[in-house]
Amino acid sequence: MKRTWQPSKLKHAGVHGFRARMATENGRKVIKARRAKGRVRLSA
């Protein structure tokens, strides 16, 4: 059986990237919360 994590930067960005976050209202809430917390990296 194959391992479950087969990394791909493109696929990862499509789900967790900045533009993916900004595309939905809830994603924007995520970015806003991470900004408020002072995270250096806002998204993948």
From Swiss-Prot:
The keyword Transport does not apply. GO terms for cellular component: ribonucleoprotein complex; ribosome. GO terms for molecular function: structural constituent of ribosome. It holds the Pfam family Ribosomal_L34. Gene3D superfamilies: 1.10.287.3980. The keyword Ribonucleoprotein applies. Keywords: Ribonucleoprotein, Ribosomal protein. GO terms for biological process: translation. InterPro entries: Ribosomal_bL34, Ribosomal_bL34_CS. Belongs to the bacterial ribosomal protein bL34 family. NCBIfam families: rpmH_bact. This is Large ribosomal subunit protein bL34. It comes from Mycoplasma mycoides subsp. mycoides SC (strain CCUG 32753 / NCTC 10114 / PG1). The lineage of its organism: Bacteria, Bacillati, Mycoplasmatota, Mollicutes, Mycoplasmataceae. The gene is rpmH.
